[in-house]
Structures are given as structure tokens and as C-alpha cells.
Amino acid sequence: MRIGLFAVGRLKSGPEKDLVARYLDRFAKAGSAVGLEFTRVAEVGESRASNAETRKREEAAMLLKSLAEGSVLILLDERGKALDSEAFAKLLGGYRDQGKRELTIAIGGADGLDPSLYDRADATLCLGKMTWPHQLVRTLIAEQLYRAVTILSGHPYHRV
């Protein structure tokens, strides 16, 4: 199954970008052993519309346009369901085992996600009850993708 990230906003050079690249590289190297492949980070610029609702709608349209047909869509949202790392790995493995070919994890813009995306989403997850800056969300989800691969493969990276 091919996995990609969609993010509103561009990650500037710095330690966060370096960490994201490091974890996604590890994911790419280890994922093929468990049937997972990393495709890309699709970054789109934030909408310049004058109000939040229009910005969210425009950003949602960009996300939907970038989705492959039949792609599983996982939204990251502070009101989503909290999973531990093993449950996240099981979720990804389950989609893979169902024969899903594409999965996209979406990180919304500063205003959040448009309501239309929740209807389209297969799952809405959170990274805890706290609000995180977007650059750290990318780092956290990249690490969790790598951790999921190590859990699915039985690698000792994930120790409880």
C-alpha cells in the first residue's frame, strides 16, 4: 500500500524538516518488507481568502484534487480519535490487508479542516489532546509511520 502525506503550508528548512526526512527515509527503507511504500509529501500553500470558511473550503478542494481515486483518507484533527502506536500500526496493516492501494494522511491549515472532509474521511485521528504546531505534527506523524512499520515487522525499535 502506498502512503502519502498531504499538508497545508510549506515546511521551512530546519531541524523539524530534517527529522521528517529522516523518519520518512527510514519508513521508505523498512516499509517494503511489510507491504508499505512511502510516496510523497504533497505540500500546498495556504489559501489567501479573506475568511476562514472560504480558506478551509479552498484547501479541502486542493486535498481532494490530489487524492488518488479510492484512496483511504485519514485526517489529523485535535478532535479525532487517539490511538496508541500499536493501534495505529494495526489500522495501517488492516487497510493494507483489505487490499487498499493508496492511503493519504492529511494535515489541515491553521484554520483547521473543512466539514466536507470529515464526510469523505475513512478515519479522523489526533496526536493527543494538546494542540501542536504544524511542523511538529509532521515530525510526529513521520515518526509514527516509521514506528508502525517496525511494529508490523517485529523490529525492536518499538519497546513497551
From Swiss-Prot:
GO MF entries: rRNA (pseudouridine-N3-)-methyltransferase activity
Pfam families assigned: SPOUT_MTase
Subcellular location as annotated: Cytoplasm
Residues the record lists as binding S-adenosyl-L-methionine: 76, 108, 127-132
Keyword tags: Cytoplasm, Methyltransferase, rRNA processing, S-adenosyl-L-methionine, Transferase
Protein name (Swiss-Prot/TrEMBL): Ribosomal RNA large subunit methyltransferase H
Family from the record: Belongs to the RNA methyltransferase RlmH family.
Catalytic reaction equation(s): pseudouridine(1915) in 23S rRNA + S-adenosyl-L-methionine = N(3)-methylpseudouridine(1915) in 23S rRNA + S-adenosyl-L-homocysteine + H(+)
UniProt subunit comment: Homodimer.
EC number: 2.1.1.177
UniProt xrefs under InterPro entries: Alpha/beta_knot_MTases (IPR029028), RlmH-like (IPR003742), tRNA_m1G_MTases_N (IPR029026)
Keyword Signal in record: no
Keyword Ribosomal protein appears in the UniProt entry: no
EC class of the enzyme, as a word: transferase
Functional summary from the UniProt entry: Specifically methylates the pseudouridine at position 1915 (m3Psi1915) in 23S rRNA.
